[in-house]
């Protein structure tokens, strides 16, 4: 070793840097050195913002539409399945199933 030749020491497998570091946000390249990987939005502040009025308006209208649909589907099913002039099962306003559920008429 006194000849002045450069020596390279290869680390033993137990001394190498792990491929995935624990929580440091870096990764090891082939040489064993750690390279820091950053995400594109790491430096951007996160600020909570309110939703625009148009989003609230569309959501409210769609919710009302769903309530109206599911609220009318049961009476409409009665009117569609049972014809008006059927003597066995008078449907519609023939005063059977719909007036038993909703005694308003």
UniProtKB/Swiss-Prot annotation:
Pathway involvement of the protein, from the record: Secondary metabolite biosynthesis
Region annotation Disordered: where it falls in the sequence: 1-43
Gene3D superfamilies registered for this protein in UniProt: MFS general substrate transporter like domains
Induction details: Expression is down-regulated by ralstonins, lipopeptides produced by the plant pathogenic bacteria Ralstonia solanacearum. Expression is positively regulated by the imizoquins cluster-specific transcription regulator imqK.
Polar residues: compositionally biased ranges: 1-15
Cysteine-cysteine disulfides: none
Function: Part of the gene cluster that mediates the biosynthesis of imizoquins A to D, tripeptide-derived alkaloids that serve a protective role against oxidative stress that are essential for normal germination. ImqB is a canonical three-module NRPS that assembles the tripeptide backbone of the imizoquins via condensation of Trp, Tyr, and Leu-derived precursors. N-methylation by imqF and phenol oxidation by imqC, followed by cyclization via the FAD-dependent oxidase imqH carry out the three-step transformation of L-tyrosine into tetrahydroisoquinoline.
Name listed for the protein in its UniProt record: Imizoquin biosynthesis cluster protein I
Source species: Aspergillus flavus (strain ATCC 200026 / FGSC A1120 / IAM 13836 / NRRL 3357 / JCM 12722 / SRRC 167)
Lineage per the UniProt record: Eukaryota, Fungi, Dikarya, Ascomycota, Pezizomycotina
Gene this protein is translated from: imqI
